[in-house]
Amino acid sequence: MEGFLRFLVAKAILLALASSFVSCYDPSPLQDFCVAVDDASGVFVNGKFCKDPKYVKAEDFFTSGLNIAGNTINRVGSNVTNVNVDKIPGLNTLGVSLVRIDFAPGGQNPPHTHPRATEILVVVEGTLLVGFVTSNQDNNRLFSKVLYPGDVFVFPIGMIHFQVNVGRTNAVAFAGLGSQNPGTITIADAVFGSKPSIMPEILAKAFQLDVNVVKYLEARFSSNYDRHY
């Protein structure tokens, strides 16, 4: 029961905090709602067509399952469960989404960015080392902190950031993002697993690596195995 109450409190806090992001990046809505629908006869707004309001139901604003732990048996030892406009059509134009992140001991949400959203994260279970790196203009400074249950950390929009479980038990965090569809670019996957591949000579010079090391990394990532989202 205590764990369930912590889950409810964390979810309520995130929704309250994330609501402040609604107008920070996505365009503000000009109607009560615009429930997304795959219908070419609908009205095109913010990347999604709008369902006719008279056909909107409560289910358009609902999803379930965030109480269920994600499968962390993968190469990075973590799992991200997304609740965005693809899961809740009613999020369309509302500028907010939510994720649950599960970590095995030693697992990580590897360095990545959200090009369209600021992220605010709260730890529910376990111990996480989190951080983000600033832009070139700020000399790529690292801001990092160890978080415990109840701790909250913000990752500014577009900054490369990460989370790592530094505890001996599983860890769980929830994060609110200031976009209905924040997008995710995992740095290693994008650089070494792009389709088609970036020329190894380019990456070898950029990362100051032997070209054969780059070819090895590209072979590992381009296989598209166990991609992390």
Curated annotation (Swiss-Prot):
Signal peptide boundaries: 1-24
Protein family per UniProt: Belongs to the germin family.
SUPFAM superfamilies the UniProt entry points to: RmlC-like cupins (SSF51182)
Annotated localization: Secreted, Extracellular space, Apoplast
Cupin type-1 domain: residues covered: 64-215
Cystine pairings recorded for this chain: 34-50
Protein name, as recorded: Germin-like protein subfamily 1 member 7
Job description of the protein: May play a role in plant defense. Probably has no oxalate oxidase activity even if the active site is conserved.
Tree of life domain: Eukaryota
GO molecular function, one term: manganese ion binding
Record-listed Mn(2+) binding positions: 112, 114, 119, 161
Gene3D superfamilies referenced in this protein's UniProt entry, alphabetically: Jelly Rolls (2.60.120.10)
PROSITE patterns registered for this protein in UniProt: GERMIN (PS00725)
Keyword Protease: no
InterPro entries: Cupin_1, Germin, Germin_Mn-BS, RmlC-like_jellyroll, RmlC_Cupin_sf
